[in-house]
């Protein structure tokens, strides 16, 4: 197959950052996706509807005039989030979910939740107003090996949470293990999962074998080849529980190529091309539209996009680096050749 036309896709998990970084991040996401769920882990985090509305306006100010891109906002849950804020979020018209970060699990998560049971009252409210919960599913216990933190989170936290709140819609974000795939497959339909391009493309050998590759360092950390294959099978299966979420998370080149480098991969400039490469490698391009354009929207109860994109099998080279505020960001596959690219955007 040399060409494929899709309903314009959405990104159900991305980081746009703020301030001088927005011109870069918004343009790169808007070039491919019609909507994107924007993570709230700024400094300070987006914990109120008022803050979310202000951030929404800052993002919209950088949407190219040729684009219909719509940011879908989230609230950052803390142990002191008022119940009224949950109700206000549900009625806001711009907030589609609340995000649970275990405190210290990832970038700018220090204000996150230390004890999940401390927010059970908030989760009851979210369940009653049907506001989805997005979860970074890793424990932060230093005694737990970093490669086991997702699996331990499932056992300690997620399983009891799903049993306690059977009507709460939950997205298990950026899953990275076979254990997570199996859990999602067995869970009720109220639970879905996003899968990133980098967890499909790489495993921990790519990160650590021979030399350390800081631009492959992310959280959850890359796992085994067996985990990678389970994720590929899930993404390309056509099962609506699994949908696209890039977790595109830019850091400046100096922060990535550092003695203490930041976790996060900037895959936005080539995201849909990367997914196309993966699906093509599995002879599953016919399943790409479901994963990229249908299943996430259906999970959130949102209409499908009324525009299309066409991807063509034609080599192109990813930039070595890109302007990022007053700095540079190195995109995933920098300087390398990819086989798929967007040809056109078509509006019905």
Swiss-Prot record:
UniProt GO BP: 'de novo' pyrimidine nucleobase biosynthetic process; 'de novo' UMP biosynthetic process
Catalytic activity: (S)-dihydroorotate + H2O = N-carbamoyl-L-aspartate + H(+)
GO CC annotation: cytosol
Modified residues (N6-carboxylysine): 99
Superkingdom, taxonomy of origin: Bacteria
Positions of Zn(2+) 1 binding: 13, 15, 99, 247
Group of enzyme by EC: hydrolase
Pathway of action: Pyrimidine metabolism; UMP biosynthesis via de novo pathway; (S)-dihydroorotate from bicarbonate: step 3/3
Cofactor binding note: Binds 2 Zn(2+) ions per subunit.
EC number(s) per entry: 3.5.2.3
Binding annotation for substrate: 15-17, 41, 136, 219, 251, 263
Chain residues that bind Zn(2+) 2: 99, 136, 174
InterPro entries: DHOdimr (IPR004721), Dihydroorotase_CS (IPR002195), Metal_Hydrolase (IPR032466)
Active site: 247
SUPFAM superfamilies for this protein: Metallo-dependent hydrolases
A GO term for molecular function: zinc ion binding
Gene3D superfamilies in the record: Metal-dependent hydrolases (3.20.20.140)
Cofactor(s) recorded in Swiss-Prot or TrEMBL: Zn(2+)
Keyword entries, A-Z: Hydrolase, Metal-binding, Pyrimidine biosynthesis, Zinc
Function: Catalyzes the reversible cyclization of carbamoyl aspartate to dihydroorotate.
Family to which the UniProt record says this protein belongs: Belongs to the metallo-dependent hydrolases superfamily. DHOase family. Class II DHOase subfamily.
Subunit structure: Homodimer.
Protein name: Dihydroorotase
Species of the source: Coxiella burnetii (strain RSA 331 / Henzerling II)
């Amino acid at each position: 197959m040399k060409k494929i036309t899709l309903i314009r896709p959405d990104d159900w998990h991305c980081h746009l950052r703020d301030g001088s970084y927005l011109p870069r991040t918004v343009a790169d996401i808007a070039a491919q996706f019609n909507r994107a769920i924007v993570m709230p882990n700024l400094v300070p985090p987006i914990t109120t509807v008022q803050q979310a509305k202000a951030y929404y306006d800052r993002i919209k100010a950088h949407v190219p005039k040729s684009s219909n891109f719509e940011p879908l906002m989230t609230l950052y849950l803390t142990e002191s989030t008022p119940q009224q804020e949950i109700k206000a979020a549900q009625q806001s018209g711009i907030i589609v979910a609340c995000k649970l970060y275990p405190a210290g699990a990832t970038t700018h998560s220090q204000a996150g939740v230390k004890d999940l049971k401390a927010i059970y009252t908030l989760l009851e409210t979210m369940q009653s107003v049907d506001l989805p919960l997005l979860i970074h599913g890793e424990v932060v216990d230093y005694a737990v090996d970093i490669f086991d933190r997702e699996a331990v989170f499932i056992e300690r936290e997620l399983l009891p949470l799903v049993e306690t709140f059977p009507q709460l819609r939950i997205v298990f974000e950026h899953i990275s293990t076979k254990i997570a795939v199996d859990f999602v497959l067995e869970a009720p339909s109220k639970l879905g999962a996003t899968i990133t391009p980098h967890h499909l493309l790489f495993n921990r050998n790519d990160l650590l074998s021979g030399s350390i590759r800081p631009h492959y360092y992310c959280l959850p950390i890359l796992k085994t080849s067996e985990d990678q294959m389970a994720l590929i099978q899930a993404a390309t299966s056509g099962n609506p529980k699994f949908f696209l979420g890039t977790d595109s998370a830019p850091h400046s080149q100096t922060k990535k190529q550092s003695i203490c480098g930041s976790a996060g991969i900037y895959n936005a400039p080539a995201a849909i091309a990367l997914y196309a490469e993966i699906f093509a490698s599995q002879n599953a391009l016919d399943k790409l539209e479901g994963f990229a354009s249908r299943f996430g929207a259906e999970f959130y109860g949102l209409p499908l996009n009324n525009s299309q994109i066409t991807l063509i099998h034609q080599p192109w080279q990813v930039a070595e680096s890109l302007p990022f505020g007053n700095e540079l960001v190195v995109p995933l596959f920098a300087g390398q050749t990819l086989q798929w690219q967007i040809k056109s955007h078509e509006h019905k």
